[in-house]
Amino acid sequence: MQEQYNPQDLEQKIQKHWDDNKTFVVTEDANKEKFYCLSMFPYPSGRLHMGHVRNYTIGDVVSRYQRLQGKNVMQPIGWDAFGLPAENAAVKNKTAPAPWTYENIEYMKNQLKLLGFGYDWNREFATCTPEYYRWEQEFFTKLYNKGLVYKKTSSVNWCPNDQTVLANEQVEDGCCWRCDTPVEQKKIPQWFIKITEYAQELLDDLDNLDGWPEMVKTMQRNWIGRSEGVELSFAVNGETSPLEVYTTRPDTLMGVTYVGIAAGHPLAEKASQNNPELAAFVEECRNTKVAEAELATMEKKGMDTGLRAIHPLNGREVPVFVANFVLMDYGTGAVMAVPAHDQRDFEFATKYGLDIIPVIKPEDGSDLDVSEAAYTEKGVLFDSGEFDGLAFQEAFDAIAAKLEAEGKGKKTVNFRLRDWGVSRQRYWGAPIPMVTTEDGEVHPVPADQLPVILPEDVVMDGVTSPIKADKEWAKTTFNGEPALRETDTFDTFMESSWYYARYCSPQADDILDPEKANYWLPVDQYIGGIEHACMHLLYSRFFHKLLRDAGYVTSDEPFKQLLCQGMVLADAFYYTNDKGGKEWVAPTDVTIERDGKGRIEKAIDDQGREVEHSGMIKMSKSKNNGIDPQEMVDKYGADTVRLFMMFASPADMTLEWQESGVEGANRFLKRVWKLVHEHTNKGTTEALDTSSLTGDQKALRRDVHKTIAKVSDDIGRRQTFNTAIAAIMELMNKLNKAPQESAQDRALLDEALKAVVAMLYPMTPHASFAMWEALGESDLDSATWPTFDENALVEDEKTIVVMINGKLRAKLVVAADATEEHVRELGLKDENAMKFLDGLTIRKVIYVPGKLLNIVAN
């Protein structure tokens, strides 16, 4: 091996070896245990960022570790290639989304290869190709025929600038999260898939996902939002249809003083027809739709419709208000309001001078006071007629029974989860395979006419989707009759909901080859950001159950283990421009002065301007604080970047990018390289004779095997990769100081270095591959992970600490099996101990076996 560690030449050579030998290409093998490791595939935005590098490094470390465990490891990669950024880039660059996307894929593919990730490139695909989305289209038509797909007109958040529908969570302060344009409400027909039919199963099966972070499971439970309650009817004066409401607190029914309805509720629309003031308020509510998460903090507003609802049990009339906090998407779009026992209702009632009637008091008999705030705990009913004195569950059951007997309500289970709206009014997505004939009937496109191909040679004007603008494209036939194609495209979550399964058989002449899919699935380890907890991860679980029920897969869940990696942070700097706005400056263009504690005192950019330090924040284009992985690989090599990524922080925590840390990782790799070079340069070593080792040699070998045990557990079970690397570094410090005089010294070092190189392989595969060969071994890619020798861990001797009156006074080295009596005797005779015991009377001697001798004397 070369004396100097030169990653640039080395890495290229080894990557070529992997390519030439198809090292990571796998097929099904019934005789081998499989391991399917998958990192969430990238959107081809143009360049990899450090978030990508972290995600894919973790995946590669897990894959290579499992490979050395002797498993048949599949690690595929592909491209989540549809989506709005491609359209925006196409408009900006006066091109079509397709060529922009394919160029980016080519560039990013080369970047991934330079980082040395062990992918099976034979399985690569891009979701924007007809070969991929054709099967998605066919599966959608099968779901339609099963009654799991429907079309309905629904009110959507519409961004007039992007000309697209936004999910509730993409609306921030009433504006589009992407371009900050005020969002409008618009009613359009859309396609939905009935995820609600699977709500209970999606909820129940979370209990079986032992390998998932609790936080993600909790987020999904809350998103699905199962509740048990009562659906009841309030008659409305002058209306034929009653007002349906759902409540989880029927025990508070006698405290209802008004009913709130959503601005989109039919009653609100009807009431506003002859009431211009109400009509204006309804319009205001519709156009300031907010994410559900913001409901709690926003100002509560309402307006009396003039309608009166009749209480179903006591007949009292209560006003019906349009309220901005009632969402049409959730429940029935109407709520019964009990100001005495719900804080939101309380604030609203106080603001509009509505009655507040308490009907629940504390179970312990303490005083009830609802003058300042609602009493929201469960308690005992009073002023509730026949239900007085009942506790929550008794009251729940009794009131539900009475409502049911009178035909005014029933117990029901409700889910917060809504059906999945999969229509998007964009061009760059998979066409929805439906047609409408002249008689208005809607039909799925027959399988033999699929795929419905998205034309790629288009001109983007930035306003209208080319397939909506091109009237000819929509014209088709169905059973010989003229028909019009659907011009909406699928939500891009459709493609990412089943891509993991397509990797199992990417060339299959169907959505999946069941035999291959059932060999590989479920995914053993999935890696990606926690921001996908409620959308992508839930949709993928749903899609997997659809594939199961269609007979393609036998498992219930797609991902056994889930690791959510933390974000990558970097220093961010800015100066204030003439207009008072922030201009962000790249950290690489900033010179920093630090104080004695390492804190930034002053920062000057390359134009000589003093800039403000905004702290360590997520790397992003908008803050100009991204670090280009390419530059780091060119400067230090891929192995160094990978090692830093895995060492700088626990995988699930944020990682603070510090180039000094990258330099540290590089120095460490050079030290390992240097020691291997020095060792191998002295020629071959003789076999290690473990029976003739000296005490020091045994101690060093014990450290080697303790490290193997720890690293194996840290990578394989705990996934604390940073502590695994720290343990290897600690061992290297000892190996650097170890004597190399005798043949057995060198034989022991040989065993130790082979273990170090193999343990570093998942993180630094190129350097490890070369050092492994230099150590006289062949093909590290198919080697076996080092195993620790139980006998080496057995200690012949132990160090016992001697404490006198709580202070450390001596250390004893004794045989590992020394008796308490022997240790006491040695401790009391120890020279140091005797010095401190001189003239004192020993009152007590406490022995903690194998660790401590504590002497109390005065």
Curated annotation (Swiss-Prot):
GO terms for cellular component: cytosol. Gene3D superfamilies: 2.20.28.290, 3.10.20.590, HUPs, Isoleucyl-tRNA Synthetase, Domain 1. ATP binds at K621. Disulfide bonds: none annotated. Its main location: cytoplasm. Transmembrane segments: none annotated. Pfam families: Anticodon_1, tRNA-synt_1, tRNA-synt_1_2, tRNA-synt_1g. It catalyses: tRNA(Leu) + L-leucine + ATP = L-leucyl-tRNA(Leu) + AMP + diphosphate. Its EC number is 6.1.1.4. GO terms for molecular function: aminoacyl-tRNA deacylase activity; ATP binding; leucine-tRNA ligase activity. A motif ('HIGH' region) lies at residues 42-52. A motif ('KMSKS' region) lies at residues 618-622. The keyword Transport does not apply. Keywords: Aminoacyl-tRNA synthetase, ATP-binding, Cytoplasm, Ligase, Nucleotide-binding, Protein biosynthesis. It is found in: Cytoplasm. InterPro entries: aa-tRNA-synth_I_CS, aa-tRNA-synth_Ia, Leu-tRNA-ligase, Leu_tRNA-synth_edit, M/V/L/I-tRNA-synth_anticd-bd, Methionyl/Leucyl_tRNA_Synth, Rossmann-like_a/b/a_fold, tRNAsynth_Ia_anticodon-bd. Belongs to the class-I aminoacyl-tRNA synthetase family. PANTHER family: LEUCINE--TRNA LIGASE, MITOCHONDRIAL, LEUCYL-TRNA SYNTHETASE. This is Leucine--tRNA ligase. It comes from Aliivibrio fischeri (strain ATCC 700601 / ES114). The gene is leuS.
